[in-house]
Amino acid sequence: ACIGAPLLIEELKKRGFKKGICIVGEPTNMKIIDAHKGCYEYTTYFEGLAGHGSAPHKGVNAVEYAARFIDKLLKIRKILKDKTPKNSIFNPPYTTLQIGGISGGIARNVIADRCRVDWELRPVIKEDGVFVNNEIDKFVNEELLPEMKKTYPKSSIRKEIIGEIIGFDREEKSEACELISNITGDNSREVVSFGTEAGLFQEIGISTVVCGPGSVSYTHLRAHETREDR
């Protein structure tokens, strides 16, 4: 996710480029977006010890440990909801966390030695992302892994960072938003829960806005479309 933007940011830094306007083209129905949540995506891999299903005590079931991992994430999700920032401008107003997929095992009567969990969180504030990672890493290193290694020392749990997109914060005065307003005649401002590269450009001082034709409701679908008049 956002592989090209960080490279561009580094090049801009090298050239001393600190001012200007960035328009991030995304399907917003030409609405002016001046803030969005972050988007952190991960895949966690579990490796245990296979064996016959009749002797589960002799193996390390990766699927079962992955299930406990997911249960912990769901408990953390409840905490995130309870930590909803006051006056949050987002919908939903809190940091979201969801499990996108789980796969592992080869048969009912075989102890699963491998499993993977795909998961993501969309933090309202950067601190929530730090909190989630600290909590789940602590659970893995202090509870799950020690148990797995008691039976099979080569057991492992590995987290792969697919992408960590920082949030895009609302600013009282935005040159980029004013430019789009002058072009479209729309003075309203909206927020979205999906992620873009906007926060990366904002972070180095470039006035940034997210705006473009089409609707996000059609994204990631086969029937992706936009109106001709847009």
Task: State where each predicted segment sits.
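Acidic/histidine-rich catalytic neighborhood of metal-dependent amide-processing enzymes
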Residues: A1-E41
